[in-house]
Amino acid sequence: MSKRGMSSRAKGDKAEALAALQAANEDLRAKLTDIQIELQQEKSKVSKVEREKNQELRQVREHEQHKTAVLLTELKTKLHEEKMKELQAVRETLLRQHEAELLRVIKIKDNENQRLQALLSALRDGGPEKVKTVLLSEAKEEAKKGFEVEKVKMQQEISELKGAKRQVEEALTLVIQADKIKAAEIRSVYHLHQEEITRIKKECEREIRRLMEEIKFKDRAVFVLERELGVQAGHAQRLQLQKEALDEQLSQVREADRHPGSPRRELPHAAGAGDASDHSGSPEQQLDEKDARRFQLKIAELSAIIRKLEDRNALLSEERNELLKRVREAESQYKPLLDKNKRLSRKNEDLSHALRRMENKLKFVTQENIEMRQRAGIIRRPSSLNDLDQSQDEREVDFLKLQIVEQQNLIDELSKTLETAGYVKSVLERDKLLRFRKQRKKMAKLPKPVVVETFFGYDEEASLESDGSSVSYQTDRTDQTPCTPDDDLEEGMAKEETELRFRQLTMEYQALQRAYALLQEQVGGTLDAEREVKTREQLQAEVQRAQARIEDLEKALAEQGQDMKWIEEKQALYRRNQELVEKIKQMETEEARLRHEVQDARDQNELLEFRILELEERERKSPAISFHHTPFVDGKSPLQVYCEAEGVTDIVVAELMKKLDILGDNANLTNEEQVVVIQARTVLTLAEKWLQQIEETEAALQRKMVDLESEKELFSKQKGYLDEELDYRKQALDQANKHILELEAMLYDALQQEAGAKVAELLSEEEREKLKVAVEQWKRQVMSELRERDAQILRERMELLQLAQQRIKELEERIEAQKRQIKELEEKFLFLFLFFSLAFILWS
């Protein structure tokens, strides 16, 4: 019976363990489905955030495009103004040259006329009168003919010069406009390129920081896993020792069962039973069998635990190896990125420096060419007007052609540099895309399900990613029927591991999504190997041409005795001075604007103070009129209301009117009495209407007084606001003055220190004095303009103040007239009321 009970108990325990195992398995599957649902939700949230981010980026891009369009329009207007100024200057110079040439021709003709007159006078003195007259007429005719011919020639030359000048001006405007448009486009593209490079640098730095943080995080995870592995190994060793001890005890028990008469068998009986008899053998045997079964169960449990720990140890070691492999892959991935980023930044800096050098050299060469042409034109004087016209036209055409060729070369060089930069950027983006695809393929691969042998059979569980150890360990661990603190600890560790793995996966997924979005924004098209080879060959040819041209220009400058470095330093100093002068002008304009605003605020403040003082004085002089407006009650006449307000309650106006009607219809009265009654009734109705009008005007005046009081309060509030704004403007003006002083000090230091000896050699003392005098004149001019503007603003404000005062006086006069009318109406109404009340009393 005992054996059947034990077997049934064992079967019941086994069924309970199986049920617990199935329940744990179902719980884990439910948790797995919850985690998958959460992952899908997170993916949807990430996609939503990406869409919002793309919308924000699109809005920012549209805003930037709008800003650039506004800037382009402003630049176009500025360029048009500069072009018109230059054309005006060229036109004035050409007109002056033409006037000088005309004066020279007129002087030549005057000299010729004087010579002819001298000849005529000589002939007149030497010969007879007929000869004199003939010669005089012939000379006059010849002079007229020559003058007419010269006049026609001069007119033709003038018309030709005007047409040529018009053509040259049109060509010059077209060329300058195209040049400025292309220069603005190149400048904008260059700035965009610089912004793109800075953005790529920042993104690379962020990516490197993120990778370093991930490496540190994974190192910490590896360290934690190694520590857990050591703990589990110690626990397994301790369990192994317990198993060996239990095996020894089991072997001793079995030997005691085989040899019942041995002293080993007697020792436990003596120790356990004392002085027992020989008939107690069967209970002892039953106890030994129970102990043996218990030991076997414990041994089986310990062996299962050892197998689980060994499997967990193997899984942890595999996971550690995988993490180490990922760390190495991440290091190998971001090192080429760093190298490539450094190479690209160096290449970009070299290209920008080369572009600046080429621009400076082009400017200097064009300037030198212009100076040489001017010198050649000065040396080679024209023999006539036609030669002068032809030489000027040739010089202008040659200069324009040279300028067009130089600008075309500069545009070609800049476009090729931009193409190389775009090619490098596309190569970098292609490498990023390939690495991203490889990483996605690696992340898509999932590990196979882990099969673990347990005490009751085999348990198979599949994990979400590569972390199947915690789930399988939880399913196997449910073999232990009693729940111990070790079980709780292991469950907590497994939950923490799953949460940690889930967080890692979400972080990696978000990082991949960000990288994918950035790649989608940056990648603009596919690459072509032939195009790459062609662009490389073109770049090499352009570099060789540019080097040859630079060498030729340096040789030409060396022949002219110019030093390139000195020219560059001179140009840099000139640019610095121009920048400082522009800053000073900007600050002075800002100062003028602030002064103007401060003056406006002061004027408005004074106006409001004056208005408030006038209102206070008027309130102090004239006491406030207290209008007690009694609203009309429906069904009551104004006379009745006024009588009740005055305290006369005996008279009822409606009854009085009825009585007057009755008296008017009474036949006993005489005609005169009836006429008097009718007139009294009409006068009463008119008085009632008049009183109603008075009440309406009184209400309107009361509303107007309320409006004036509210306006007074508004003026006081505006005064407070203007006081605050005036203080703020004063502070801003002080700051602007300080900034102007600082800029002047900077300019003075730049002129004194940075130029050094070369500036001293360039500028003589006379030129310095001239410069100082010009600066002083400019300052005086600016101050005079500011004073004139302040005076004009003050005059305008005074006119506005006078107009406001006149308006206020008119309103006050109107209010006083209305007050007088109200008083007169009140007096008339009182007189009428007394008259009719007296007449009614006498009549009754």
Curated annotation (Swiss-Prot):
Localization per Swiss-Prot or TrEMBL: Golgi apparatus
Region (Disordered) location: 250-290, 466-489
Listed Basic and acidic residues bias regions: 254-268
Tissue-specific expression: Specifically expressed in the CNS and endocrine tissues. Also detected in other tissues including heart, testis and prostate.
A molecular-function term among this protein's GO annotations: microtubule binding
Residues with Phosphoserine modification: S384
Entry annotated with the keyword Transmembrane helix: no
Biased composition (Low complexity): 269-282
Cellular component terms per the entry's GO annotation: Golgi apparatus
Database matches in InterPro entries: JAKMIP (IPR024836), JAKMIP_C (IPR031994)
Entry's family note: Belongs to the JAKMIP family.
Protein name: Janus kinase and microtubule-interacting protein 3
Lineage: Eukaryota, Metazoa, Chordata, Craniata, Vertebrata
Gene: JAKMIP3
